[in-house]
Amino acid sequence: MDFSWTEEQKIWRRTVRDFAQKKIKPMVREIDTNKKIPENIIKDMARLGLLAPTVSKEYGGSEVDWTMACIAAEELGRADISLAIPVMYLVEAAWGYIFSRYGTHEMKETYLPKVTSGDAFIGIAVTEPEGGSDILGTAKTTAFKKGKNWVLNGEKMFISGVTESKQMGGIHLTLARTDPDAGHKGFSFFAVPLKHNHNVKTTLLEDMGRMGISTGGFAMGL
């Protein structure tokens, strides 16, 4: 079995490395000081297809495979970890992909083109104040049906992109228990917008490192 890089992968690595070293690396101190990734960098990443890159082309993504996504994350991380893990890889690539695979067509049409163009943020909200790894044993956020709507009650903590989602718009894929008797099958993801959402109260935390993206939490219905 041949594990060497394909020519396409080599070109992709060189392209992302060149962008990261020329555009991102000189801005690292400014990113850390301002605790924000400049909009021009986000837009440049969008033009290169680095935002939610695993999303299908139908919704504006690059539709790259996971090897290509990991190559991009590695090269971005050489310049600044804020862009490599929370934005490009962990949040945008992974959860953009999950949403594109399991979300409704209407919701995907509404949010994904804005995410891939850098005009909205998509994040994940699973961790809670009492735990994040043992979700089955610690998750207390619940959701119940009320008419045609769902009502969520609970709190999420240590969530990437709280400020970005609140300012730019977008969604956090939020895990809630919908059936207390169904074990691990009793959970569902809900697309929760933070911008202009008066039913959600957000909080912010101070990070040590990866300063370019916010970390915080939000409470629903409490």
Model-derived regions, located:
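A structural signal for short hydrophobic beta-strand segments in well-ordered beta-sheet cores
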Residues: 141-144
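Flexible, small-/acidic-enriched active-site or ligand-binding loops
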Residues: 138, 198-222
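A short, Trp-centered hydrophobic/proline-enriched beta-strand micro-motif
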Residues: 118-127
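Intrinsic disorder at enzyme termini
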Residues: 1-11
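C-terminal helix-coil-helix/basic helical segment that borders enzyme active sites and/or dimer interfaces
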Residues: 25-36
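A short core secondary-structure module
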Residues: 149, 153-204
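Active-site-adjacent elements of ketosynthase-type condensing enzymes
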Residues: 130-139
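Internal helix-loop-helix
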Residues: 47-118, 161-171, 182
